[in-house]
């Protein structure tokens, strides 16, 4: 059986794609898996590192507003569909799985023309344009949140890797803090804006470095490719670690090291933090169609997280809120338990079984 997984751009698409790929391999070791992406996405790094072949097609950005870029979409789409047909000729998949993003629309169009079974997985509460289109003719549609408005949607959850879903944070804490060069005993704040980073978030938190250090709070800060994390001069003289990295490959250890995370509210960030029982301050991206705030809302309503609007995340807010929160072990434990109770940890295998059911039926014909 052969499977083509189409998705990429950011970790929001690549992480569930790779989690599904790994689950397929566990359930059906002989399955042949190929990933489909574009030359500009994170998939060019993480897919080969995970050991899966990667095919590339031109990206087809879908503008949210009318303009010159919208006029270019038909031409870009035709070129990308042609490239996808060439990939389908080489791979000959029995089933295609799409995760949204710039690569998915041409994959959906070409797959439909070939009559290949299609599975669509939507990561956010508010579906993107490509997945809204693909869901109209997909054989199966899976969603990460129970109230996502897609036709014939099945709630399976967001696929995450077992290294995350099965993480025992307390058991791995000492190892994790040593891995990142952190003190083994200090309260620890994790800061991440996702694979793309979040410059304003980075600046607001890093400017509080001295005040956080004065209260004994150490920080692990993944600033992303756009940077912006610049701990104030003198913060290092306190002896309290403030570790800045561009990207964290071992998010399992980052979660294990942390007592609290400040992050955006992409589906991946929300699901992973909740799954490991890590209390979170969610700062939704202030653009798009509001999907990030909606992603975080179930965790917030359950008491597992705090919502702070991007404009309200100031250095003063960080200084006034974070130290007393990370010092309140009872509140953190309650938040973590509330978040963890919401998340299905077997979504990777749930989605993989849907894919296998369709693909094995197709290959038998």
Curated annotation (Swiss-Prot):
Function as written in the Swiss-Prot or TrEMBL entry: Cell wall formation. Catalyzes the transfer of a GlcNAc subunit on undecaprenyl-pyrophosphoryl-MurNAc-pentapeptide (lipid intermediate I) to form undecaprenyl-pyrophosphoryl-MurNAc-(pentapeptide)GlcNAc (lipid intermediate II).
GO MF annotations, alphabetized: UDP-N-acetyl-D-glucosamine:N-acetylmuramoyl-L-alanyl-D-glutamyl-meso-2,6-diaminopimelyl-D-alanyl-D-alanine-diphosphoundecaprenol 4-beta-N-acetylglucosaminlytransferase activity; undecaprenyldiphospho-muramoylpentapeptide beta-N-acetylglucosaminyltransferase activity
Membrane-related topology note: Peripheral membrane protein
Taxonomic source organism: Nocardioides sp. (strain ATCC BAA-499 / JS614)
GO annotation, cellular component aspect: plasma membrane
Protein name per UniProt: UDP-N-acetylglucosamine--N-acetylmuramyl-(pentapeptide) pyrophosphoryl-undecaprenol N-acetylglucosamine transferase
Residues bound to UDP-N-acetyl-alpha-D-glucosamine: 10-12, 124, 161, 195, 248, 292
Pathway: Cell wall biogenesis; peptidoglycan biosynthesis
Main EC class the enzyme belongs to: transferase
């Amino acid at each position: 059986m052969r499977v083509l997984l189409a998705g990429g751009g950011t970790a929001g698409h690549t992480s569930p794609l790779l989690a599904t790929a790994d689950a397929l391999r566990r359930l059906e070791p002989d399955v042949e898996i190929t990933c489909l992406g574009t030359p500009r996405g994170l998939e060019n790094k993480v897919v080969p590192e995970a050991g899966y072949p990667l095919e590339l097609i031109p990206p087809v950005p879908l503008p949210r507003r009318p303009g010159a870029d919208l006029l270019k979409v038909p031409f870009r789409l035709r070129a990308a569909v042609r490239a996808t047909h060439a990939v389908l000729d080489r791979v000959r998949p029995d089933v295609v799985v799409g995760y949204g993003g710039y690569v998915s629309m041409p994959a959906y169009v070409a797959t439909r023309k070939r009559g290949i079974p299609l599975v669509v997985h939507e990561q956010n509460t508010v579906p993107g344009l490509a997945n809204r289109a693909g869901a109209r003719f997909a054989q199966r549609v899976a969603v990460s949140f129970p109230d996502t408005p897609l036709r014939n949607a099945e709630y399976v959850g967001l696929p995450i890797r077992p290294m995350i879903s099965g993480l025992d944070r307390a058991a791995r804490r000492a190892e994790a803090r040593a891995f990142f060069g952190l003190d083994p005993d200090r309260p620890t704040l994790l800061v991440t804006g996702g694979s793309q980073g979040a410059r304003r978030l980075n600046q607001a938190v890093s400017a509080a470095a001295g005040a956080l250090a004065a209260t004994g709070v150490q920080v692990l800060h993944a600033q992303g490719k756009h940077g912006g994390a610049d701990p104030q001069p003198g913060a290092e003289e306190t002896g309290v670690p403030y570790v800045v990295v561009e990207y964290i490959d071992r998010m399992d250890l980052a979660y294990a090291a942390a007592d609290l995370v400040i992050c955006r509210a992409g589906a991946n960030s929300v699901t992973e933090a909740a799954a490991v029982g890590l209390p979170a301050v969610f700062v939704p991206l202030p653009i798009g169609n509001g999907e990030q705030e909606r992603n975080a809302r179930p965790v917030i309503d359950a008491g597992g997280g705090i919502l702070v609007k991007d404009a309200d995340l100031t250095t003063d807010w960080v200084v006034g809120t974070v130290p007393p929160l990370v010092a309140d072990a009872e509140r953190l434990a309650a938040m973590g338990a509330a978040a963890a109770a919401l998340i299905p940890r077997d979504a990777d295998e749930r989605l993989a079984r849907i894919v296998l059911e369709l693909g094995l039926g197709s290959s038998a014909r």
